Swiss-Prot record:
Protein name: Glutamyl-Q tRNA(Asp) synthetase
Cofactor binding description: Binds 1 zinc ion per subunit.
Upper classification of the organism: Bacteria, Pseudomonadati, Pseudomonadota, Betaproteobacteria, Nitrosomonadales
Names of required cofactors: Zn(2+)
'KMSKS' region, short sequence motif: residues: 235-239
Binding site for Zn(2+): C101, C103, Y121, C125
Motif ('HIGH' region): 12-22
E.C. number: 6.1.1.-
Its job: Catalyzes the tRNA-independent activation of glutamate in presence of ATP and the subsequent transfer of glutamate onto a tRNA(Asp). Glutamate is transferred on the 2-amino-5-(4,5-dihydroxy-2-cyclopenten-1-yl) moiety of the queuosine in the wobble position of the QUC anticodon.
Sites where the protein binds ATP: K238
InterPro entries to which the protein is assigned, alphabetical: Glu-Q_tRNA(Asp)_Synthase, Glu/Gln-tRNA-synth, Glu/Gln-tRNA-synth_Ib_cat-dom, GluQ/Sye, Rossmann-like_a/b/a_fold
Amino acid sequence: MNPAACVGRFAPSPTGPLHLGSLVAAVASFLDARAAGGRWLVRMEDLDRPRCEPGAAGIILRQLEAYGLVWDGDVLVQSQRDHAYAAALDMLKAQGAAYPCACTRAQLVQAPRNREGEMLYPGTCRNGLPADTVARAWRVRAPDASIRLHDRIHGDLQQNLAREVGDFIVKRADGLFAYQLAVVVDDAFQGITHVVRGADLLWNTPRQIYLQGLLGVPTPTYAHVPLITNVAGQKLSKQTRAPALPERGRDATLAQALVTLGHPPPGELAGAAPAELLTWASTHWHIENVPTHPVVAKPAP
């Protein structure tokens, strides 16, 4: 493919500063784009406003710069794009692919769960709202068909949306648009061709591919890098109190991220500046070297 046509992205949620797990995802997407001579964009996924932390977006951008991860173009901010998501929802409504749902969480507490612990919607409102109810959210009808996906790290996968996911929400009861819709709209808007992100989002990908088909937008290639866990096996996150990226010793932290991705830098680069490490890594990037299994973050000595 024409290298100039390769566009990757890093799309953090500003719920706090970046940690090692988010650095690994950022580095992987950066290297994948740069190795192809392409562009690397940044998007702030602040769609879930109640979870966002004031000032976190600025902190994240400064962390990226400090670690040598320089992006192209302007940063796209999801909270400024409700008009685009509303237009996409209108398209789904016009096709009959989306329908209003009046169900509350309390009403769905007994619904079955899938292997990811997500609720499998029982279809209560699929054929129309029950009497004396009002719409609270909007769902997309999940087809009883397998959505196929080739992941550049995990290989060929498939998921039956109706049986494994169920009709899923695209606009929430609190009026916020759901991640599944927003990410599809924004990837298309930014011309993203290569999505490289954490393996916790692999399960969501067939839903996004289905929405791409309904909305008539291209499907990018996907690669899901391993999750970084603590010694208890929990994904590094704000909820598990993952420490923020250190301001000192960035070379060692970046080298740790590269080792995690199966690209250990040579000994002569010990202590090298982040920009030098990333230059080396972009010329040696081979996505087939990235492991498929979660990696335990070793505590700092």
